C-alpha cells in the first residue's frame, strides 16, 4: 500500500500519529481533513508526528499566500505534498502547474472521465513535453 488518506476522523491527531509510527516508513499517511491546508493545524500535526504528508487544496484555505505557507511548512517538516482538486472543479488546469512548481509527490484530480479532470492531465502532458529532458517525476519519497 503506497498511501492512506485520512484514515481517521478530522480531529484524531493521536490516532493519526499511531498509524504513522506503525506504517509511515513505507506508506504515505496523508492528512486532508486533518489539516484542511491550515498551517496552525499542520503545526500541531508536525509536533505530534501525526502524518508524513499533506493534501493541499488551493481554494480550501482561502489565499494563494496561505497555500504557499502550507506547502513551505510541509517541506520544512520533510513531508510530501499532494496537490488536489476540489469537488465542483472547473476545467482550469492551474493545479497541474502548481503541482509541478512545488514538486508535488502526486496530483489528485480523479479519473480522467470528465472534462475538468482531463484538462489537468492534458496540461501535465504539455508541461512534460515543454520541459523535455529537464522533466522530473517527484514521485514522493517512497517511489524515489
What residue spans do the PLM features occupy?
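Catalytic core of soluble alpha/beta enzymes
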Residues: 1-144
Amino acid at each position: 500500500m503506497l498511501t492512506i488518506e485520512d484514515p481517521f476522523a478530522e480531529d484524531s491527531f493521536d490516532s493519526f500519529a499511531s498509524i504513522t509510527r506503525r506504517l509511515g516508513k513505507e506508506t504515505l499517511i496523508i492528512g486532508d481533513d486533518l489539516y484542511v491546508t491550515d498551517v496552525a493545524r499542520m503545526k500541531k500535526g508536525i509536533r505530534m508526528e501525526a502524518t508524513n504528508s499533506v493534501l493541499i487544496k488551493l481554494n480550501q484555505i482561502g489565499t494563494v499566500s496561505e497555500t504557499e505557507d502550507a506547502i513551505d511548512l510541509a517541506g520544512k517538516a520533510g513531508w510530501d505534498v499532494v496537490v488536489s482538486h476540489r469537488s465542483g472543479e472547473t476545467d482550469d488546469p492551474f493545479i497541474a502547474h502548481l503541482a509541478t512548481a512545488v514538486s508535488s509527490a502526486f496530483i489528485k484530480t480523479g479519473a480522467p472521465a470528465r472534462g475538468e479532470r482531463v484538462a489537468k492531465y492534458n496540461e501535465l502532458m504539455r508541461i512534460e513535453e515543454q520541459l523535455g529532458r529537464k522533466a522530473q517525476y517527484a514521485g514522493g519519497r517512497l517511489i524515489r
